[in-house]
Amino acid sequence: MAPKRQSPLPLQKKKPRPPPALGLEETSASAGLPKKGEKEQQEAIEHIDEVQNEIDRLNEQDSEEILKVEQKYNKLRQPFFQKRSELIAKIPNFGVTTFVNHPQVSSLLGEEDEEALHYLTKVEVTEFEDIKSGYRIDFYFDENPYFENKVFSKEFHLNESGDPSSKSTKIKWKSGKDVTKRSSQTQNKASRKRQHEEPESFFTWFTDHSDAGADELEEVIKDDIWPNPLQYYLVPDMDDEEGGEDDDDDDDDGDEGEEELEDIDEGDEDEGEEDEDDDEGEEGEEDEGEDD
């Protein structure tokens, strides 16, 4: 599984902290420390604070340089992402198969969601140029009986304070085809409620902006599926695996049967040898009788 990479938060400019105005005499007395050497301790504390300011400065510089490296490699990856998308387009139902095979995404998919996702042709994740301010996820669809849109987009933004927000394309549902409404009605009839993390329909996610910071689906798509979708498309069929195990068991049973047959044959051979010995003994007794 590809390692998850989180977009760094915006950098906060840190002001150097002034040396702490500690009542050292009072502190020393309350801690039971001797007053001797208080001046040296005060100087040490001031120097520690100066060193800490330098550490903070380096941490800030480190974050800025990491962002530059990320920006560089994002540009280098783009041609390969484009080539991968072109190849994926040659495989029917690649997108819906990938989502269905992913354990977290599949739990959000209803039957009608899967039907609509069969028209999905491409998914793309695009980070904003500065990276730290957010990214966009685009879903491309063929002509279908569910909605008019050819592209759905959902954007995630981080402001200067690091607070997340999101916005998305409005889905133009065709008459009577809004799967989010039907899903909601079905759940009301069954008197069931889902948590925020599990919307009634996969497509409800596009209109849910209530808590962008707790959006698990966008993290899964961006940090898990997008880096390497092939690993989920190629998930082996569990039925095939179980069938293979049954075949192995049958082979083992067959081997055991052959061993039992071999044991029986060996037993028959032993009995045959004993019969020959008995016959030889009887012949010997008859010969002795004739001599007499």
Swiss-Prot record:
Induction: Up-regulated during protein-induced pluripotent stem (PiPS) endothelial cell differention. Up-regulated by VEGFA and POU2F1 (at protein level). The keyword Metal-binding does not apply. One of its GO terms (molecular function) is chromatin binding. GO terms for biological process: endothelial cell differentiation; nucleosome assembly; positive regulation of transcription by RNA polymerase II. Signal peptide: none annotated. It is found in: Cytoplasm; Nucleus. Residues 1-11 have a biased composition (Low complexity). Residues 35-78 form a coiled coil. GO terms for cellular component: chromatin; cytoplasm; lipid droplet; nucleoplasm; nucleus. Its main location: cytoplasm. The keyword tRNA-binding does not apply. Keywords: Activator, Coiled coil, Cytoplasm, Differentiation, Nucleus, Transcription, Transcription regulation. Expressed in endothelial cell (EC) and protein-induced pluripotent stem (PiPS) endothelial cell (EC) (at protein level). Gene3D superfamilies: 1.20.5.1500, Nucleosome assembly protein. Residues 1-43, 158-292 are annotated as: Disordered. Pfam families: NAP. Residues 237-292 have a biased composition (Acidic residues). PANTHER family: TESTIS-SPECIFIC Y-ENCODED PROTEIN (PTHR11875). Belongs to the nucleosome assembly protein (NAP) family. Plays a role as a transcriptional activator involved in the early stage of somatic cell reprogramming. Promotes the differentiation of protein-induced pluripotent stem (PiPS) cells into endothelial cells and the formation of vascular-like tubes (in vitro). Involved in the transcription induction of vascular endothelial-cadherin (VE-cadherin) expression. Associates to the VE-cadherin gene promoter. Probable retrogene derived from SET transcript. This is Protein SETSIP.
